[in-house]
Amino acid sequence: MDILLANVSGLQFKAERDLIEQVGAIPLPFYGMDKSIAAVCNFITRNGQECDKGSACPFRHIRGDRTIVCKHWLRGLCKKGDQCEFLHEYDMTKMPECYFYSRFNACHNKECPFLHIDPQSKVKDCPWYKRGFCRHGPHCRHQHLRRVLCMDYLAGFCPEGPSCKHMHPHFELPPLAELGKDQLHKKLPTCHYCGELGHKANSCKQYVGSLEHRNNINAMDHSGGHSGGYSGHSGHIEGADDMQSNHHSQPHGPGFVKVPTPLEEITCYKCGNKGHYANKCPKGHLAFLSNQHSHK
């Protein structure tokens, strides 16, 4: 009835024009003031650029390149204002993903403002299954989606093209970027003892054989197999200075055990006599005095 009596659809009142042009909007007295409850600036949404008032504009400036909602703005703690690189507008589809739901597949906050994404929607299609066969079978961590094969494409040409409702298989090998770490070929280990591929040093046959040979020689040394009354580990440590002379003359290699110096050639550094180590010197702790008298 109002349209029949007084049709004003073609008229524009001054108040409407003032609202569109934002007439009477007072600039902000301070920079960085909170504008979270203010309306959206019409000029920036219309032109896609900053309005004439700039950062002093009392309205919010929303840009299209901001696709994620600012988590600090949700709590009223964002200090960047219009200079923030995130979106200052509550949009559930543009919210960041909930950490607890993505990590533990559960979020106990009934009013959680963050986005809950189903883990099944994150699973990518298996590139090998698309090609025709996946050796992992049902244990593959990628999604195996069954599709009906397009017989026209298999014959050589499909008139529907990409809009075909049936599956167009790809016979080329999937690129490395689409493969997971478990689908890549594992690098063979290298033995640090013999340098061969396929095994590690702890399972190397050459290393095990040389280790057994070394243990047999050590057992013979401890049982008194060498003449001269060699006294085991303690004598070996004390006579290390005298055995350094034979260190460079003896060859080294896998499975080689250095033969200790005979006791007759050992020189006691306390008294200067041969035939015993310093820890078994018969002159005791004052043996260095007799060593000084002998030099005089």
From Swiss-Prot:
Zinc finger residue extent: C3H1-type: 35-63, 64-91, 92-119, 120-147, 149-171
Pfam families: zf-CCHC (PF00098), zf_CCCH_4 (PF18345)
Compartments, record wording: Nucleus
Keywords carried by this UniProt record: Developmental protein, Endonuclease, Hydrolase, Metal-binding, mRNA processing, Nuclease, Nucleus, Repeat, RNA-binding, Zinc, Zinc-finger
Gene3D superfamilies tied to this protein: Zinc finger, CCCH-type, Zinc finger, CCHC-type
Domain of life: Eukaryota
Keyword Cell wall biogenesis/degradation: no
Tissues where this protein is expressed: During oogenesis, expression is detected in the germarium, in nurse cells, in the oocyte, and in the somatically derived follicular epithelial cells (at protein level). At oogenesis stage 12, nurse cells degenerate and their content is transferred into the oocyte. In larvae, expressed in all organs and disks (at protein level). In the larval salivary gland, expression is initially confined to cells at the anterior end but later expands throughout the entire gland (at protein level).
Protein name in the entry: Cleavage and polyadenylation specificity factor subunit 4
Species annotation: Drosophila melanogaster
Lineage: Eukaryota, Metazoa, Ecdysozoa, Arthropoda, Hexapoda
